[in-house]
Amino acid sequence: MIIPSIDLSNGKVVQLQQGKNKVIERDDPLQLAEQFSRFGEIAVIDIDAAKQQGENRDLIKQLCRRYDCRVGGGIRNVEQAEAFIQQGAVKIIVGTAAFTGVGVNEPFLSALAKRIGKNRIIIALDHIKGKVVTDGWQQETGIEFRQVIKQLEKYAGEFLFTCVEKEGMLQGTDLEAVGQLRSLSDIPVTVAGGVNSLEEVTRISAMNCHIQLGMALYQNIFSLEESFIASLDFNKGLLPTIVQDASGQVLMLAYSSRESLQKMFKSERGTYYSRSRKNIWVKGETSGNIQQFRKIRMDCDRDALLMTVSQKGVACHTESYSCFGDRQFRPETLQQIVKQRLQTAAPDSYTASLNQTALAGKIMEEAQELIEAETEAEVIWEAADLFYFMTVLLSRKNISFELVFRELDRRNKTKDKR
């Protein structure tokens, strides 16, 4: 997995060399996150909090509400970690707090694992020549990472392994040290610091490690799309590619090659490799039933893909919406219909005629009717009415069901379950 990094300082996106010299500053964190999220999780690092020179928590909260973020930087107690989880972070990165002056801070890590779960904890092994550094990489501990791996494994769902002396330098990472860590532990490892070529991306991925990228992306050494392709395992040939729509309904099974993925990322149209014709083909090129690329994920073995698209028309050559049957009616389906009617604004469209005042009145009315409904049929009928008007309200405010469901999922993952 490729994990792009958004490092924050004073509300801006920055890139530092060895955690010190700032060489890049941008003011578009939300736009970057939208772009990065198409490929999976994002690492969001609060540089100011790590150095105890401020914090960027409000901005991080915004990012966590919309995207799958692993959050780190200055998390020094259980309460801070739990707060980020409650705000929507999928994982927490802890570094400084995981160590004392002479070893592992087991009381803290034990309490953290009990509070948020071991699977959500990423322990940062920030090191200079094999020795752990803390406090924004400013403090040397003298602790050899090799000596504490087994002790840390009890509390970690993953390690973030950063070669600090190479961080931001674009001189290549320490592959020997990565190999040593990989030989010592079987839990997931994310490698960061100095990655400077697609060849290196391929080598690290083949070591069964994730890769966190920063400077190489921001300096345009290579693109996120290129690094995603480089991390895949093509040793068995073409990659099976499951294609689904935004609601999660499977549309078709296709196959991808390096070249088809390159073309797809460039055109943002569903593009695949035909095993029968032995060439690259673009979905909808002749029929007009095109697929707009939205996001992509690789599986755990890096040899299969799950791609989400916006489907125009139908996906199957039989004129069925999906190669696996007709379209399923889901909340996203209803919202798509509502948005179309709002955009078209036909004179005879009841949906388009609903102004804010009328819409508010109908929601209040239908909510009351749902409360008063008695039979099963009445409850279903009134719930459907309320759901429809709620969908119109969300659509007018340009809020997707995806964001609503993310909020419900966030609440479900916190300790205060309802």
What does each model-identified segment do?
Residues Q138, F145-R146, T190, Q212, ...:
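Flexible "arm" and connector segments at domain edges
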Residues E41-D58, T96-G101, F161-Q171:
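Glycine-rich, proline-tolerant flexible connector loops at the mouths of alpha/beta enzymes
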Residues L8-K22, I85, A89-E167:
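Conserved anion-binding
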Residues A33-I45, Q87, E153-Y155, F159:
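Catalytic domains of carbohydrate-active enzymes, especially glycoside hydrolases
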